[in-house]
Design a protein with these regions (language model features):
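Membrane-embedded helix-loop-helix hairpins and adjacent transmembrane boundary segments
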Residues: 2-12, 20-558
Length: 558
């Protein structure tokens, strides 16, 4: 029982590593406010000034809805790959996974693989069709041959659920992370992040968001690589020397490099893996990036570049964790009261930062802290833009106005929606400050895997899909994912205070995603209406466009 409980804590941590929401407080160590880091603040101010300058430049280029939502479709594959990686890799990827590698060894690397396996599926099955069939949001694809109003409404609702929970989780994690790294108060941190997010998206749209993500990805790759190179130099750049010394000093010994210590609950492990893999393919802010490139070829390049960057960075993080075992784990200066093996100063998530200080001094520590703050802004900007697009493009323009809205009015709604989402995120972030928000991230990925992904993949590949089937599957996936998370320990026990959870597992995808697929297939098969016949017949035209790109949106001229 104890072992299973420990696994659940680490599983909750793992799903949060894709966001800044879960800082491993329960699984690795508490978040402790540090002294004000002036080096980090100074470097972050430079980053903010640079990105505000880019936003000013982007605002002059953002004149149409295509500019606002997709940067006019003129981003190259390499640029978009960097931006996708910047949108995907968060500060907690660096801090949380390094800490997990430091404590659990090779099992943490297995979790990294779980985060990665969704990318090949997107590359081979989705990237080309996403670009050829969509324009601004993934609802353009799911509603391509189906009832626009009903399907777009369902897609927008599920998108907003994912975005809102993910955004609030990001904001709570941002406040805690900034308190940890910069020594700033939680409320001040939230206001700074919320204000900058609203400025980037409201004025700069996708152009500004893209370049913020590109710069952040470059900073994260440079900072992580620099720390890794400096750390590995202490082992003569020998992986054998590193592992030998790490095994010699770590409490797990040889088991540090043996897998299987976290498999006490295989159902949760499988459900977590499914949620991470298929949830990635249903995240609105990730899917939206495929509409920013010029054509399907560049969309495939985007995924290839993003996959390579993410894979490279995960390997960097793995090396950082192992290096920290020796460099940080044997230095009493990084432990409370100088007791090696005791509590790490600042909490377990400070392992990467302590390693940076050990190999590069205060300047490198300040730079890496500034990078962590920059990652927060990049991720929340992408989320805010995805949420605003669902409101303005899917609900306002296509459902309420039924395609008659002017570009000016749609842009106005987009910007007001961004401001509204920013205010809501800050307020909810303040309200949820003391709460473990792992369930929010679980819910975001659960809904993405259970509501968005099944409808999206079936709309692209199955001729038999009908509006009724899509609606049934989408809403059942949404409701079942939310219900199972509420009935799990994360909410039923930790939040509502009941003694035992009704649903025994913390991750819903293994149960809610098959329900969604089953509903889609059964309801579509049973649908004998005239509309269903027309929708099935329209698949041939959709297939031609998906394969050839004929009729797909083109890049705007600037």
């Amino acid at each position: 029982m104890k072992r299973a409980t420990y696994f659940n804590c680490l599983a909750a941590l793992s799903i949060g590593l894709l966001s800044n929401a879960v800082l491993a407080g329960d699984a690795i160590g508490p978040t402790v406010k540090q002294a004000i880091n002036y080096n980090a603040i100074g470097m972050f101010v430079v980053f903010v000034l640079l990105t505000l300058g880019i936003t000013y430049w982007a605002a002059n280029r953002t004149k149409t809805t295509a500019d606002f939502y997709t940067a006019g479709g003129g981003i190259t594959g390499a640029q978009n790959g960097l931006a996708i990686a910047g949108d995907y890799m968060s500060a907690a990827t660096l801090l949380g996974l390094t800490a997990m590698m430091y404590t659990q060894g090779v099992d943490a690397y297995i979790y990294m693989i779980a985060f990665f396996v969704g990318w090949p599926m997107i590359l081979f099955l989705m990237a080309e069709r996403l670009r050829n069939l969509g324009r601004f949001t993934f609802a353009d694809i799911t509603s391509y041959r189906l009832n626009q109003g009903k399907v777009r409404t369902m897609a927008a609702i599920s998108s907003l659920v994912v975005v809102c929970f993910y955004l609030v989780a990001q904001m709570v994690g941002a406040g805690q992370l900034i308190k940890l790294l910069f020594g700033l108060d939680y409320g001040i941190a939230l206001v700074i992040v919320g204000a900058l997010m609203m400025v980037y998206v409201t004025f700069g749209g996708m152009v500004a968001t893209t370049w913020v993500q590109i710069i952040k990805a470059g900073m994260l790759l440079f900072g992580g690589t620099l720390v890794m190179v400096l750390a590995m130099s202490q082992f003569g750049f020998s992986f054998e020397e590193l592992t030998t010394r790490a095994i010699g000093v770590h409490k797990l010994g040889v088991k540090l490099l043996n897998p299987g210590n976290l498999l006490a609950d295989p159902v949760t492990a499988i459900s977590l893996g499914l949620g991470l893999m298929f949830g990635l393919a249903g995240l609105p802010h990730i899917l939206m990036r495929f509409f920013t490139v010029t054509n399907a070829k560049e969309a495939r390049k985007s995924v290839l570049y993003a996959s390579g960057i993410v894979a490279y960075f995960f390997n960097v993080v793995a090396l950082l964790g192992l290096c920290a075992v020796v460099i940080v784990g044997q230095n009493p200066n990084f432990f409370e009261e100088g007791q090696i093996g005791g509590k790490i100063i600042g909490g377990g998530n400070m392992v990467a930062m302590h390693l940076a200080k050990a190999v590069g001094g205060d300047m490198l520590l300040g730079f890496l802290s500034a990078v962590a703050f920059a990652t927060i802004l990049a991720v929340v900007s992408g989320l805010a833009l995805a949420g605003a697009s669902a409101i303005s493009h899917d609900l306002y323009s296509r459902v309420i106005k039924q395609g008659t809205a002017s570009e000016i009015s749609e842009l106005r709604v987009s910007r007001f929606a961004t401001i509204g989402l920013g205010i809501i995120a800050v307020v909810l972030g303040l309200l949820f400050e003391k709460m473990n928000v792992a369930f929010m991230v679980a819910l975001a990925f659960g809904v993405a895997a259970s509501a968005n992904f099944p409808v999206l993949i079936m709309s692209m590949y199955w001729k038999g899909l009908t509006t009724r089937g899509a609606i049934a599957g989408g809403y059942l996936g949404l409701v079942s994912a939310v219900t199972l998370v509420v009935l799990s320990k994360s909410v039923w026990v930790s939040v509502l205070g009941y003694a035992e959870p009704i649903f025994p597992y913390t991750q819903p995808a293994l149960f809610s995603m098959p329900l969604a697929f089953l509903a889609i297939i059964l309801v579509s098969k049973l649908d004998r209406s005239k509309a269903a016949e027309l929708e099935r017949a329209a698949f041939a035209d959709q297939f031609v466009r998906a394969q050839t790109g004929v009729g797909a949106a083109t890049a705007a001229a600037h």
